[in-house]
Amino acid sequence: MVEAINLKQVSERKFTGIDQPKLEWAKNWLKNTKKSYVNGKWIEASSSSIFESINPANGEKIGSFYGAGKDEVDKAVAAARSAFDQGPWSKMTRKKRAKIMHEISSLISKHQAELATLETLDNGKLYTESYNDDVQEASDIFAYYAGWTDKYYGENNPVEGDFLSITTRDPIGVCGQIVPFNYPIDMAAWKLAPALAMGNTVVLKPADKTSFSAIRLFEIIDEANILPPGVINLVLGDGSTGSYISRHMGIDKVTFTGSTQIGRQLVRDSADSNLKPVSLELGGKSANILFDDAPNLDEAIDRSFYGLFTHKGEKCSAPTRLFVHRNIYDKAVNRLGELADSYKLGDPFDPETNQGAQVSEEHMERILNYIESGKQQGARVVAGGKRDTDGDNINGYFVRPTIFAEVNNSMKIAQEEIFGPVLCVIPFDTENEVIKMANDSIYGLGAGLWTNDVSRANRVAKKLEAGMVFVNKYGCYDFASPFGGWKQSGWGKEFAVHSLQSYTKQKAIWFAY
């Protein structure tokens, strides 16, 4: 996994070096109503529920799928259980399992343009973002975890007396995985790859607004005939389908990325069913602190902007609260306003476009309501603050990049997750003051700070209440480093060995001699 933001690439948005969108192919592929994938077969739902998917860039229907109900979830869980208990996957040699995962990685790369096209049609993000970020990373994470299959060890416990005690980690079993709308194929891969690497089987549900790239991924794997039936299962639908997963007695673990509100419900579902472990990657309101001794101030301001406004701000770890020292506050606000005003919104397949459409009309309206709240509470709109309906954008769900200045940290826009292109710029005077404000949040996913003072960097990083802290470059992610938050930003970690551990159950074995 590479650095999340390349400023030159973000500013240019060219298709140089990547395949062109496969729009005609996608149009034909989307003609048929899509089905869930259970036990190696595509099945229609027993109910008559059909979901329509809308292109956020123009408000037009692009395709549909059958919603899965309780019967389909039951069948998927039964197939996954059989594949785990009786099938070859959990008992397969690690070398062979790694080979299959490398094949999946290669297949994703081979079909990269197809998957990116579906992602952009479904989600509204730029094609360059779908291609270079989402699909590329999905391929990379399968390759990364393929390398872990034969490198995961147990422990020899230093117990007292005439005993030998060892600890093993076994596959946890059938995993329910619920994926969000903002990075559909990427988040699916984040969850599928470590689960499969440890020998588990999966029932995965994509977001109802953005299901098509996951459907195509399962098609690609199915066509390659490389996984035994039942190892991976795909159930389509809305929150009710997700509830069947989270409450199911036959599922051994649930992992979820999405809102804190839904995360709480999944915890209740676990308590009301079989107390299955739950991994949660939830909301964020990440603080980004710009001290007046920041190295290369212009780049720090620019990166603070792009760290939020790529992927149209629909990012849980986005630095949505920018705390700026009062000595440089006006300069930062003016530059941020210039960047926001320069952004071109429109067709996400147009290489000149800087920002695509919000995922749905409902989500756009939610963002606009937050913007109105900011205005009413006294924040000053520096740029944006409205829907973009210019030209062909009239029917799309576009929100101008919005910069709020003179924000008080207690305002609604500074405390609640907006999940859109809205930045709160908050002044501060002292180090202790800004640490207190940064930590004044129910969330604790990410945080950033910019300073030339090494002592300050270390001191502040230790005091920030967040699962990830970025010093002098916000948004540095790598599969080798854990991704996840504190407080109400979730439980558990994605990436590295930490994700693998969450897909295992630990056993201590004692020998007397």
Task: Name each region found by the language model.
Residues 84, 88, 105-112, 116, ...:
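Structural signal for hydrophobic packing residues in well-ordered secondary-structure cores
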Residues 61-68, 85-89, 177, 288-292, ...:
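Short, well-ordered beta-strand elements within core beta-sheets of diverse protein domains
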Residues 59, 97, 119, 199, ...:
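Residue-level signal for inorganic ion chemistry
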